[in-house]
Amino acid sequence: MKTEVAKIENVKRDWYLVDAQEMVLGRLASQIANILRGKNKAIYTPSVDTGDFVIVVNAEKIALTGRKLADKSYYSHSGFPGGLKEISAGKLLEKKPEELIKRAVKGMLPKNKLSRHMLKKLKIYAGSSHPHDAQQPKVLAL
C-alpha cells in the first residue's frame, strides 16, 4: 500500500477563531503557524498547502514577556541610502497590532513560495469583531 500524497483539490479547509487576549506572542504565533501549514491534519504534505484559515481577534491585547516591549526592535529598509527604519515592539503594538502578530507568524513559516499562500489565510483584527461570520469559524482554545 502506497502512502497517499495530498492534492490541492482534495484539501478541505476549516476556519478557526483565536482570541489573542492576554496570550504570549511567540507561543501563539507558533501554534497559528502550525495550523496555517496544516501540520495538525493527517494528510499533511510539506509540498502542498494543506492548512486552514485562522482569524485572530483582540490583537491589541497580546502579551509580550520580559522587557520585549521596549527592547525588541523591528527593521525595514526603503532601498535608498540611509533608509533603515527601526520601530520597537511597544510602538508597533500601539500603531499596528496586526503587524506584530503577522511578523511573528511569518518568521515561523517556511521560507519558500508556499509561505505567501499560507500567510494569506491569516486574518488579524485589532478589536473583538471580524467580518467572517459567514464562514462559521470554530473557536480554538490555545
UniProtKB/Swiss-Prot annotation:
Which controlled-vocabulary keywords does the entry list?
Answer: Ribonucleoprotein, Ribosomal protein
Signal sequence span is none
Task: Name the InterPro entries on file.
Answer: Ribosomal_uL13 (IPR005822), Ribosomal_uL13_bac-type (IPR005823), Ribosomal_uL13_CS (IPR023563), Ribosomal_uL13_sf (IPR036899)
Q: Would the keyword Magnesium be found if you checked this record's keyword annotation?
A: no
GO CC, any one term: cytosolic large ribosomal subunit
- Which Pfam families does this one have? Ribosomal_L13
Q: Does the keyword Zinc apply?
A: no
Q: Which GO terms describe its molecular function?
A: mRNA binding; structural constituent of ribosome
For the biological process aspect of GO, one term held by this record is: negative regulation of translation
What's the family? Belongs to the universal ribosomal protein uL13 family.
HAMAP family found in the cross-reference section: Ribosomal_uL13
Q: What does this protein do?
A: This protein is one of the early assembly proteins of the 50S ribosomal subunit, although it is not seen to bind rRNA by itself. It is important during the early stages of 50S assembly.
Instruction: Share what the entry says about its subunit structure, partners included.
Output: Part of the 50S ribosomal subunit.
NCBIfam families of this UniProt entry? rplM_bact
Which protein are we looking at? Large ribosomal subunit protein uL13
Which species is the source of this protein? Answer: Pelobacter propionicus (strain DSM 2379 / NBRC 103807 / OttBd1)
